[in-house]
Curated annotation (Swiss-Prot):
Protein name, entry field: Cytochrome c oxidase subunit 3
Gene: ctaE
Similarity comment text for this entry: Belongs to the cytochrome c oxidase subunit 3 family.
Compartment(s) of residence: Cell membrane
Entry EC number(s): 7.1.1.9
Chief place of localization: membrane
CDD domains named in the record: Heme_Cu_Oxidase_III_like
């Protein structure tokens, strides 16, 4: 009797500990996004230091005249819209709606790809105006910050593709739903970073 009570008494704390134990996927995602946040914080710092130096020698303002703000706003709206469609996909995954998940993630992939292509077109236009990564301090700051962000967008698009391929090849499982949510966290993060870059580069200048 005592043994049974003792075992029950030991089992209860173990169950509580199991319930309170952090999900390793969540912890890993938080750690990864924290590292990414520090990386982009460094890029923002680099941009503002370059901006201060450029303003000091008078070479910064004339470079920003090449920016097409309405065009940048358009591709920004496209990227932000992809965050909305991504979240719709997550809602579908939580309901076990595989068709909805596929549909919304596919739309997200298309919108993300349009953003990358749009940014590539902007690069071509700016290079045509003589603005390159080697042409000036501003050119270096612009292409480095936006270029690294574009690489993160491409990585996000590829992650969506991987999720869809895994869903297509096997039965939909809770693990796949979790993977979809983790990818969405990364995508929302990339979108928020771009909003910060857009405000900094195209409005504050």
């Amino acid at each position: 009797m005592t043994s049974a009570v003792g075992n029950t008494g030991m089992a209860a704390p173990q169950r509580v500990a199991a319930l309170n134990r952090p999900n390793m996927v969540s912890v890993g995602t938080i750690v990864f996004l924290s590292q990414e946040l520090m990386f982009f914080a460094g890029l923002f710092a680099m941009y503002f230091v370059s901006r201060a130096n450029g303003l000091a020698n008078g070479s910064w303002g004339e470079q920003t005249d090449h920016l097409n703000v309405p065009y940048a706003l358009l591709i920004t709206v496209i990227l932000v819209s992809s965050s909305v469609t991504c979240q719709f996909g997550v809602f579908a995954a939580e309901r076990g709606d595989v068709y909805g998940l596929r549909k919304w993630f596919l739309v997200t992939i298309i919108l993300g790809s349009i953003f990358v292509i749009g940014q590539g077109y902007e690069y071509i236009t700016l290079v045509g105006h003589g603005l390159t990564i080697q042409s000036s301090v501003y050119g270096s700051a612009f292409f480095i910050t936006t270029g690294f962000h574009a690489l993160h967008v491409i990585a996000g698009v590829m992650a969506f593709v991987v999720v869809l391929m895994r869903i297509h090849k096997s039965k939909f499982t809770p693990a796949q739903a979790t993977a979809a949510m983790v990818v969405s966290y990364y995508w929302h993060f990339v979108d928020v970073v771009w909003i910060g870059l857009f405000i900094t580069i195209y409005f504050i200048q």
